[in-house]
Amino acid sequence: MTPRLVGGIVGALKREMGGASAMLTSFEAKEDGSVSIAGIYPGKVMPVTLVAGQEFVAEQSAFLAAEDTVQYTFQTVGLGAAFFGGEGFILQKFVGPGTVFIHIVGDVVEHDIDGAPVDIDPGHIAGFDATLQYKIKFVDNVRTAMFGGVGLFLATFTGKGKVYAHSVSKFKLAAEIYLEGQQTAHKK
C-alpha cells in the first residue's frame, strides 16, 4: 500500500479543487490477497472496462478505484449543469486501457443511446460513454417539474453510447432518510 500523487503536483491540485483527494493509495500484490472497495451510500460497485483510447465520463463522487493504466482528468460542464443539474460543476474523465470502478447509488439503470435524443434527470446520472453529447435543458412544463418530482432540468443525450444512472439520486435518498428520522423522533 503506497500513497501517491496522481498527475504530479498539478494533477493533485486539480483533484483537490475538484473535491477529490490529492492523494490516491496504490495497492500492489506481493502474494495472493484481495482489496475491497465500497461507496458510502447503499448501491452497486460497477466495473467499466475501457480499451486503449476509450473514454468514459463519471460524476465527481462516483470514482472508487482504477487500474494504474487508466488515465484520469477533470472536465468542467456549463454553469446550468453545475447549479441546477445535480451533476456538479466538475466531472471525471477516464481514458483506457484498463478498468475503472464506479459507485452507483441504488441499482444500475443502463440506457443504450443510439441516435435518438434521450432525456434523463441529471441527479441520476452516474456516468456515460464520452462518445455521447449532452446538454442541460429546462423542463418544458414547470407544473410537471414542481408536482411530478422530476426537477427543473433534464440532461438530453444524443449520439451513440451508454449512460449509467442511479435508480435513486443521492439527494432523494438523503432526504428520505432524514424525513424518516424526523418522523421516528416525533413518535417517541
What do these predicted ranges mean?
Residues 1-188:
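Phosphate/adenylate-binding glycine loop and adjacent helical scaffold
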